[in-house]
Swiss-Prot record:
Gene Ontology BP terms: macroautophagy; protein transport; transmembrane transport
Transmembrane segments: 144-164, 189-209, 211-231, 246-266, 291-311, 336-356, 396-416, 434-456, 485-505, 511-531
Designated gene of the protein: ctl1
Protein name (database record): Choline transporter-like protein ctl1
Subunit architecture: Interacts with atg9.
Keywords noted in UniProt: Autophagy, Endoplasmic reticulum, Glycoprotein, Membrane, Protein transport, Transmembrane, Transmembrane helix, Transport
Role summary: Required for the normal organization of the preautophagosomal structure (PAS) and for the correct subcellular location of atg9.
GO CC, any one term: endoplasmic reticulum membrane
Deletion phenotype: Impairs atg8-processing.
Lineage: Eukaryota, Fungi, Dikarya, Ascomycota, Taphrinomycotina
Species name: Schizosaccharomyces pombe (strain 972 / ATCC 24843) (Fission yeast)
Amino acid sequence: MFSDYASRFLAQSRFSSVDQRNFKYPTSRSNLQSVSIDRNSSIDSHETDLSAGSSSLHGLNSLIDSGSIHWQLREQEQSNSHISRNENELFSKENSIYNGNFSENLGVQPNPQTISHESVNEEYTELPYDAHLPSEQKVPDRKWGLTFGFLTLALFTYSFLMVWRTNPNIPPATSPYAAIQKAFPLFHKDAIICMMLSVIWLFCLVAIPRFLYFLLASVPLTMFAFAVYLLKASRIHLETSIQPKLMLLTGIILLVAPILLSYYVWRRRIHFETSFNIIRLACRVIADIPQITLIFISFLFSFYVLIFIWVRLFARLFLRGSTLVGSVWVLPRSSWVLASFYSLHFLWLCTFFHALQCAIISSIVSQWFFYRDTKSSATKTNLVSHFFYHVVSNQYGLCAFSSFLVVITKVPLHFLPTWLRHVSRIVYYMFSKTSASYVTSPLTLAYASIYSVPYMNASKALYQIEQLNRVGLRRRSYYFSKYTLLAARSLLAIGVGVTSWNYSIHENGVFYGYIVGLLGGFLAWLIIGAIEGGLSMIVDALLICSIIDISSCQGDPNGSHCFEAWQLFESNGY
């Protein structure tokens, strides 16, 4: 009995001494120093009481049998834990006062009205709300959602008026309208094939662990095969057509791309295992919540319907105000200007649907990440339907604003020279005080949808996070996993575009076959994006939830809600 007491007392004394040695008190903080003095005095008083109790009894055996030792140890442990909690609270409040960020109203979610550039870090460490608990319904960026709705309604109204006023039987077979109309059966076949391949691809990722290695190895080989195919097809002799030259140029690009891709993969071969494990963790989320596949399939069919409605309306533009000169169909400049506006709005519309999908998936992943072990009577189907309704009804403005910023910021930067990109980023930073890379990042939309805050506030929050250093992040496993998923999407889009282009040349005319190829590739890009993009959205949401979790548990893996995510993102430096 005495040995048990002695070992327990020595262990507790050693733990207390180690804790006191490791705890560093700030020299300029009087509150914490007073707490330290009170703690030492309370420990001394407990030791005095223990020695007094020992001397007052008649023997060691009676002291041990009385049970006072156990009572005193429990009292000391409770008092020490209470003092530790007070110290932590005082330390956090004093830090907030010292930094000028202290606020009396501490909520679970960031306040979209009071969030500022200086206080985003403290609000970022708070966990998102539980979907099973009642919460305040907020509609961030509502005016942008209404603006997007009015513009879409106006554009479709004009399109239906144009359909009513134009005659599809006038143009000859060499017009763009005739080429697009003849390619519609091919588009339907390509869309069905893309949907089947995307579903099979997702099933293989979830069911076959080593499928990613096969996918990464097949990308350069398939691109090389497409390059040889285009170089061979460019030998056809077509007068008054630039398509052989375009085929030759595209074939050369596809011939050089596998070499650059192989070099990039070889230099980052050390990130193979970590990046593949990140994708496997995303597949685990799908396996735990299989209802996410219903979100994927619903957006898959939404893109399918949207594309074919828009393509038919877009083809009607080439009937507007046209005149026939000989056998050539001449288009006025206004038709090309309207076609440009149609293309930009369609790009905004597709990005809006993509943002809706990202917001829904990010909310579901955050619920799985933080509350998957919480007992609740709600089923997973109810959870998915709740977030679907919440995003569609309350976050449509957020999705509209984020998609608008992506279209006007990210798309032009891809076509500008390098020096103009730097100049545009500087000008953008002068007006928004935030880097353009954070404004167009999918991580910003994931954070904004999880906390239901305005989009610009979310970009400011991410701008303050040290873990998201954009310079170092591009060299890490997170981006390699994203590029692996993007490679599969690009491969299918290139394949569909090349086959549509070649089919249009040999079967339906030669003058505007490249338009058919571009539409076919864009069709495949959007359809496979509903699956591949959804998996990439899960990876983004896991990264955001991991950063929130790491900030809330102060980097301690024992306090993490998902140890696998902490091991993949924090221990490997993302």
